[in-house]
Amino acid sequence: MSRRPAGTLSAIENEAIQEIRALRASPGEGIHASLLETPARMARHFILGSHGNVQLRLATIAQELGVEMRTLERMFFDEYDQTMAEFQLETRLAFSKSLLCIFPPTKISAVAAILGYNVVQDFNRFFKKQTHKSPSEWSREEHARIASGEAQRSRD
């Protein structure tokens, strides 16, 4: 993944900042109001909304929320019992697996791009580190598993 120059925000970070500002301007009720209750909830919201995109730098979110990164990390851990980095990885992996399960299969380069990787090999490395299989190998096995399950159900 290529690095952005310091001070340059990714599109996903700009969207998050605009959403934070819009929520503050008109907090309303319901889910929007609950997001503003704690910075940890807001961070989780953006991680989920971006599917764990690698271009979402959580320090940018912390700064916009007016808290130190370390404070946000502690708040997140206290509320969700895992670090933001762990949650971001978990979210990214789950989303990539869901895209790789689609039939016809989503191209690995498309999955990598959706998750913010500028270089497909970086996504492949991430995926293999998490699953011990390449994305294409995991996808093939998952499609075979799904097909065998469907074949079994049709015989029953």
Named regions from a protein language model:
Residues M1-T71, F77-T83, L100-R125, K133-D156:
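Alpha-helical bundle regulatory/interaction domains
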Residues L36-A40, Q88-L93:
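Generic hydrophobic, amphipathic alpha-helix propensity
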Residues E90-S98, R145:
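Alpha-helical structural segments
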